[in-house]
């Protein structure tokens, strides 16, 4: 009986870790690394926060494409350019990267720490 409990616990830990991972083959960059990418025409910058969050404070290089409507608007993005994704903390942007990967975008990058880590 104790063995079954250990197995169940191991499965729960595995599922938790898998849910917390930002995704396979998703590059992570810091906000300091992000600054060096501005002006690069081979990059697309999207902010997946809500419109209200975006209006309150955003980085001028980023286009607002809220996570909840990302699947409907992903066709506006080029699959030939890298997509840099940001949110408030890095969690929604990690989810957005997974969504984009599933839709066939091969080069997506998550900004670690999101706007919480940003400073001009």
Positions of predicted regions on the chain:
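Conserved beta-strand segments of alpha/beta enzyme cores
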Residues: 44, 61-63, 107-109
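Short Asp/Glu-rich motifs
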Residues: 57, 119-120
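Catalytic cysteine-centered active loop of the rhodanese-like fold, especially the PTP/DSP P-loop
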Residues: 71, 77-119
């Amino acid at each position: 009986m104790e063995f079954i409990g250990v197995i169940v616990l191991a499965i729960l830990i595995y599922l938790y870790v898998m849910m917390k991972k930002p995704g396979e083959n998703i590059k992570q960059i810091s906000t300091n690394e992000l600054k060096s990418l501005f002006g690069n025409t081979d990059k697309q910058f999207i902010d997946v926060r809500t419109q209200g969050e975006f209006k309150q404070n955003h980085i001028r290089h980023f286009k607002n494409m809220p996570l909840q409507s990302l699947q409907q608007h992903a066709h506006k993005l080029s699959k030939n350019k890298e997509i840099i994704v940001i949110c408030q903390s890095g969690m929604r942007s990690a989810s957005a990267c997974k969504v984009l990967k599933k839709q066939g975008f091969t080069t997506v990058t998550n900004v670690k720490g999101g706007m919480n880590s940003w400073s001009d």
